[in-house]
């Protein structure tokens, strides 16, 4: 799971999963892959884009800090950055270039996403 969320919701026709952090915490990769891009989105904040070998791309937006570099290999659960208390983490997923509902690929439990 990227973070322990106090609540979750979907945006943009379920192509973005929004997780609210109850406290400041580290954000983890949700799949194995390589960091393809880092940057800042004017609407969603700082982000990391992770590309996996099986045509999946994971986007993590809303980070208060980024701890990875472009080209860096990552394993599932590796630390990629952090999010502030009360901050929103926006999770996007592409499969073969098409937006998919990230909630379908992650186990959602109360307190854990």
Language-model-detected regions and their locations in the chain:
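Conserved, short, structured surface segments that act as functional micro-motifs
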Residues: 49, 70-113
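Small beta-strand-rich domains/subdomains or short beta-sheet motifs embedded
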Residues: 20, 26-30, 60-61, 71-74
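Residue-level recognition of beta-strand microenvironments
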Residues: 2, 38-39, 63-66, 83, ...
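Generic structural signal for buried aliphatic residues
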Residues: 25-27, 33-36, 74-81
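Envelope-exposed proteins and targeting segments
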Residues: 13-15, 23, 31, 44-46, ...
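Zn2+-dependent peptidoglycan hydrolase active-site motif and core
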Residues: 30-64
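Active-site/binding-pocket entry motifs
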Residues: 4-10, 35, 41-42, 99
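Short glycine/threonine/proline-enriched tight-turn/helix- or strand-capping micro-motif at secondary-structure
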Residues: 2-29, 52
């Amino acid at each position: 799971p990227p973070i322990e969320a106090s609540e979750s919701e979907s945006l943009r026709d379920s192509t973005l999963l929004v997780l609210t952090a109850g406290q400041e915490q580290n954000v983890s990769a949700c799949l194995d892959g390589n960091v393809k891009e880092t940057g800042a989105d004017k609407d969603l904040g700082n982000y990391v884009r992770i590309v996996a070998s099986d045509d999946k791309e994971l986007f993590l937006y809303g980070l208060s800090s980024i701890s990875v570099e472009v080209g860096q290999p990552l394993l599932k659960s590796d630390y990629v950055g952090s999010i502030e208390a009360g901050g929103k983490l926006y999770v996007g997923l592409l499969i073969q270039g098409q937006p998919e509902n990230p909630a379908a690929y992650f186990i959602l439990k109360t307190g854990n996403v």
